[in-house]
Amino acid sequence: LYGGQQAVALQTNDQLMTAETFDDAIVAYRSGGPVHIRDIGRAIEAPQDTTLGGWLNGKPAILLAVFRTPGANVMSTVEAIKKALPQLRASLPPGINVAIVSDRTQTIAASVADVRFTLLLTIALVIGVIAFFLRKLWATVIPAISIPISIIGTFAVMYVLGYSLDNLSLMALTIAVGFVVDDAIVMVENIVRHIEGGAAPLQAALDGAGEIGFTILSISISLIAVFIPLFLMGGVVGLLFREFAVTVAVSILVSVIVSLTLTPMLCAKLLPAAGHGKEGRVSRALEAFFTWLVHAYDRGLIVALRHRRITLGVMLATMAATGWFFVVIPKGFFPQQDTGLIVGVSEGAPDISPEGMKQRQQAILEIASRDPAVASAVGYIGPGGPTVTENDGRVFITLKPKGQRNVTADQAIARLTKAVEQVQGMRLYMQAAQDITIGSRLSKTQYQFTLVDIDQSELNFYAQKLMAKLQDLPELTAVASDQEAPGRTLAIQIDRPAAALFGITPATIDDTLYDAFGQRHIARIYTALNEYYVILEVNPQYQLGPNALQRIYVLSQNSTMVPLSQIASLSPAVTPIVVNHQGQFPSVTLSFNLAPDATIGAAVSAVQKATRDLHLPPSIATSFQGNAQAFQSSLSTTPPLILAALFAVYIILGMLYESTIHPLTILSTLPSAGLGALVTLLLIGRPLDVIGIIGIILLIGIVKKNGIMLVDVALEEQRDRGLSSEEAIHHACLLRFRPILMTTMCALFGGVPLMLGTGTGSEIRQPLGYAIVGGLLVSQVLTLFTTPVVFIYMDKIGQALSARSRAKPSRLADAMRIAK
């Protein structure tokens, strides 16, 4: 109200704040007296929805799942939440506590810490290899300097690109350690060789850098070319590994710049002249060992060159074996991780009551809590979030740290699955939470297969038949369906003429039923911190069973109460409690986990065969979803991806050498690496998954450097000294034997910590280590003998083609001759 000088605000006590005040509220007047709520019912303080329930270790709880927004850093997000918790706790009433039940960032932090240790261990191992081969302080320090410089330079580029330091980028840096020292090792070894030949350090640095610069450039550019297909790879997998590829490529690029500039300068300034310093006994012993090793290799090389056809046959057999092993090796998607979290879906009968669901869900949580590997078990029931029906619930089981339990997550799932079988009328489907998941479709188990049809009854019929077949497959376990069994329904058939006699419409009947059983929200209570719904329903004791409808009366037009039974009939029926859709059509999704020792490749093939054997009608469309669909996509793109990497390397090498022949010699080193990687994965019982494929692609870049170093020297010997192809490649093999051995050992020791890692998140890194180590071991043994033979044959082919082109006059020459 506004006066001449002042304004006054109006405020009423229109809001009832407690159940007692609602009890005193007047809703009508009858016979001249007021009718209070307490006269016809009662107001109580109670949960908003009694069909819902949540528990933590046996105590009632409200569960809150927090997800970061796209682009947000999960570690900083969780840290901000933890900082806000004390203030939140202070605002809650006594007796209510807020606790973090499951924190995925702890696993992420542990995994990052483990891979950080792996990175440091790799650096130490690589420096040890350099010291073992060069046996001189500064000759060891100079290549080692390239490691931190390359890593720091990579960090700078990652920062500009907005990348974060996570498992994939750290894994990329770990692998890159073996790459970034290669260039410096080759440069230092060549300069040291000139110094030992009598040259001054400065002159040796100039001569050595000029001599080996093109080789280093060829190695690095062709290595970066390997990652071009990864840069262009589409889909979610491509997005995941684009950062990996960029990280490795940038580190290699920085190392090239360091090796061609800083490394020669340091060699000129820090390396002593020949004869300075006295070699120790260990150094002399190592030098004698390397000399013996070179002589032994020389003897073997002479035999290989003498029996060229046999050696070439070995290489061709290696190529054939690589193709055969690629076909027969089991295929996977991503390694199964043990993140310490198990997520589960509990499913009761479609007509189970909320009270029955609560009792069984609590029994499941109690059984899970008693397991020695479990740190906490939390769950809830009722519609909300990913749960859409009252007979479904969710379970989240946090396992103890790996050091405090003697079972993996999958073993814990198997044990818990057997333990909860004692809970009658409930099924529990569990899966180990994974850091990398594709797709947003939620299912009871890990992999999904969807059927879509326009005819719901036909779809349900064939979905049930297919599910029965899938349950018999040995490759699958925990087969589930989102097709809920029909639930009990009480059909209310309104007698419209009878209702019309009383002036009652169907809408009035619907409103009456909603008032009684629908938990109608009729008001809100607002407080300083919260708001509460005022809910209307009949007394819970009058909601038990179909007989409750006998007590329902409907208000007629003349204000008389008419029994519902007088204007409607009741009949029991069954009906689906949920109908799922995909693309606006009815759908059923069958989900499954993998049986022990089964691969997703075998499971997908088994599901496809079972589907074909069922002879589904043409109207039913089928497709894999989520991880299974991404696996199919990655499986189909793997051969083109590898071929694209080979083609990119061939094009780059062809441009560098201005030849179409010699790049083939270099690429001939690759089949043995692929064979080693595939055989290693087979021997340890691992499938060829996305991580293993990345390892094979990396091997393309690593192994071809051996061929580049040999071909470079051989071509130079032919050009400068006029040697035959056999003499040139023989000399090149002996001259480059030590740097080849050094660079291979550095790359190999870069993969060993990944291969042997057992810490948190090691499951996803191990296939990369196994593929690299196995591929390098086999290729190192074979390519040192097969590459020289291939060079000789390719050189002869090149000479023959050159001679033919010289002998055949060009059309222009013919035209000029005719004109004359």
Predicted regions and their residues:
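Helix-loop junctions and hydrophobic alpha-helical segments within the transmembrane domains
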Residues: 101, 108, 112, 188, ...
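Transmembrane alpha-helices and their membrane-interface boundaries in multi-pass membrane transporters
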Residues: 177-191, 213-232, 239-283, 395, ...
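Transmembrane helices with small-residue packing motifs
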Residues: 159, 163, 231-240, 275, ...
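Membrane-interface helix starts
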Residues: 119-123, 213-214, 276, 302-316, ...
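Membrane-helix entry/capping segments
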Residues: 68-72, 78-125, 157, 165, ...
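Signature of alpha-helical transmembrane segments and their immediate interfacial
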Residues: 212, 281-335, 419-422, 449, ...
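Surface-exposed amphipathic alpha-helical segments in non-transmembrane regions
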Residues: 1, 15-50, 57, 72, ...
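Hydrophobic transmembrane alpha-helices and their membrane-interface caps
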Residues: 124-193, 200, 232, 250, ...
